[in-house]
Amino acid sequence: KEMTPLVEPLSLDEAFLDLSGTTRLHKKIPAVILAELSKKIIEKVGISVSVGLSYNKFLAKICSDIDKPRGFSIINKKEASNFLKDKPVEVLWGVGKTLKNKLNNDGIKTIGQIKEMEINEVITKYGAIGSHIHKLSNAEDNRVIKPSRKVKSISHETTFEKDTNDEDFLKKTLWSLCEKVSNRSKNKGLGGNTINLKIKTKDFKLISRSITIDEPTQIAEIIFQAAKLLLLREINTNKFRLLGVGL
């Protein structure tokens, strides 16, 4: 916050910074400000930093994911369209496995293909989220930085009709929950590197387990693999009536 008061947490180790208007204050352009901030974090905290600089949240997040763990990428308005056009559709926030499969089945595999479509066509084919992904495909993201926002967690759970310890059934259910968590995290522009598992036994004993991965994620497969490790440690003769996963 020495650089700007407009800091919005994205996850425990990620944040958006709005550097609009800070050039006059610091007498430096945003790229230099961020380079100095990265150096300071490395020196004082001892962790690597990946920086993405752009004119909206969506592009800044994509930039920050390039060349991790010590990447520094910049996308300006002139470059945005060309940068996005060949990226796979799942890069778009809100495109989880189900929507990705629908798009792919329709022959749409890149962001550039969505950009070429009329917005009404995208909405007709894919529902309300069509407007959202069409705007992102055109590098449009009008969300503002919200400094007061607290780091959020996203979770889904389900209660079974019958208590069970069937491993295949539990893993199938876990995958479905992980997909839901992934889709919601993409829609909200959130990510996390702590995966939480919640299970309730047939005698109503609540068990919570968590695991931390190296990098924040929104990807269902990564969430699932981590949560599955936790689940398999708990499966025994005991039967479960509830299963939940969170990020």
PLM segments and residue spans:
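Gly/Gly-Pro- and Ser/Thr-rich, intrinsically disordered tail segments characteristic of DNA damage-repair
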Residues: K1-K125, I129-H132, I145
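DNA-contacting surface of Y-family translesion DNA polymerases
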Residues: V91, L99-L242
